[in-house]
Amino acid sequence: MFGTKALRAAQHAVRTPSIKFIGKRTIPAVVDHTPQPHPASPTKTLPASFLSSHATFSVYRDHAQQFGPLRKTITPNAGIGGSPAVALGPVEPPQGVYFDRNDLPERFRRQPLTPDEIEAIETGGGHLLYRGSYL
């Protein structure tokens, strides 16, 4: 018992923390927000199309492909819900594509659970150890 106490005391005396605190951080006075190429870029330059077509980020955002609330030119008849489903016509899956699992061939369908499997799920498998049998 005393040996364990002495061993623990020795471990705590030698232990040094892994975290080194470097002190309070300082905020730079000037922050450059101009577009920069990624440091791992092979060409070390931005694409020419980016610089020529987008003067600011807000201009880029206006021209970016958006399908949500960022797009400013949303029309009521565009996108999902713009026209009734009847106007879309019949929806048929292509050859080899199935919408429902029950449309698949028999070998790919879900197998029904046996009573033993249902019992194992409901009891957490405890009855299998009690009965001495496994699935």
UniProtKB/Swiss-Prot annotation:
GO terms for cellular component: mitochondrion. Keywords: Mitochondrion. It comes from the Eukaryota. Its main location: mitochondrion. It comes from Chaetomium thermophilum (strain DSM 1495 / CBS 144.50 / IMI 039719) (Thermochaetoides thermophila). It holds the Pfam family Kgd4-YMR31. Belongs to the alpha-ketoglutarate dehydrogenase component 4 family. One of its GO terms (molecular function) is oxoglutarate dehydrogenase (succinyl-transferring) activity. Component of the 2-oxoglutarate dehydrogenase complex (OGDC), also called alpha-ketoglutarate dehydrogenase (KGDH) complex. The copmplex is composed of the catalytic subunits OGDH (2-oxoglutarate dehydrogenase; also called E1 subunit), DLST (dihydrolipoamide succinyltransferase; also called E2 subunit) and DLD (dihydrolipoamide dehydrogenase; also called E3 subunit), and the assembly factor KGD4. Within OGDC, interacts (via N-terminus) with E3 subunit and (via C-terminus) with the complex core formed by E1 and E2 subunits. One of its GO terms (biological process) is 2-oxoglutarate metabolic process. It is found in: Mitochondrion. Molecular adapter that is necessary to a form a stable 2-oxoglutarate dehydrogenase enzyme complex (OGDC). Required for incorporation of the E3 subunit into the E1-E2 core of mitochondrial OGDC, and acting as a stability factor for the fully assembled complex. This is Alpha-ketoglutarate dehydrogenase subunit 4, mitochondrial.
